[in-house]
């Protein structure tokens, strides 16, 4: 099992797709890291040698990207700042509503949560 930046990568996936389990790395940047580490794109996570894992770990730790914990902290602080200055986006985050102008009369279920049923009024 390969462990990078505190994340256990899935065992039987191709290494490019396994790297996307690290917060902040998408498929494109994963492919660039693999190319820099001189690892074949068809290599599975189980087939990575310890030397290749060390090279990959060094590349990820020394890159200029914010990854994993730093990125989560950065995003959390940005949302906290929006809440503190009481702007529209901060209010939307606080109320668990869509932030980027999407409609809420219908849809937005994943952001707002499951429907809350209201009992009908008896006559």
From Swiss-Prot:
The gene is rps13. GO terms for molecular function: rRNA binding; structural constituent of ribosome. It comes from Thalassiosira pseudonana (Marine diatom). Residues 102-123 have a biased composition (Basic residues). It is found in: Plastid, Chloroplast. SUPFAM superfamilies: S13-like H2TH domain. Part of the 30S ribosomal subunit. This is Small ribosomal subunit protein uS13c. Residues 90-123 are annotated as: Disordered. Located at the top of the head of the 30S subunit, it contacts several helices of the 16S rRNA. InterPro entries: Rbsml_uS13_C, Ribosomal_uS13, Ribosomal_uS13-like_H2TH, Ribosomal_uS13_bac-type, Ribosomal_uS13_CS. Keywords: Chloroplast, Plastid, Ribonucleoprotein, Ribosomal protein, RNA-binding, rRNA-binding. GO terms for cellular component: chloroplast; mitochondrion; small ribosomal subunit.
């Amino acid at each position: 099992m390969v462990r990078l930046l505190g994340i256990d990568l899935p065992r039987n996936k191709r290494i490019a797709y396994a790297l996307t389990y690290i917060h902040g790395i998408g498929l494109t940047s994963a492919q660039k890291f693999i190319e820099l580490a001189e690892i074949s794109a068809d290599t599975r996570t189980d087939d990575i040698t310890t030397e290749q894992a060390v090279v990959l770990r060094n590349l990820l730790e020394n890159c200029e990207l914010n990854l994993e914990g730093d990125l989560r902290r950065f995003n959390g602080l940005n949302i906290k700042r929006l809440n503190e200055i009481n702007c529209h986006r901060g209010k939307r985050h606080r109320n668990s509503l869509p932030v980027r102008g999407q409609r809420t009369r219908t849809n937005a279920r994943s952001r707002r949560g499951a429907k809350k049923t209201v009992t009908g009024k008896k006559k």
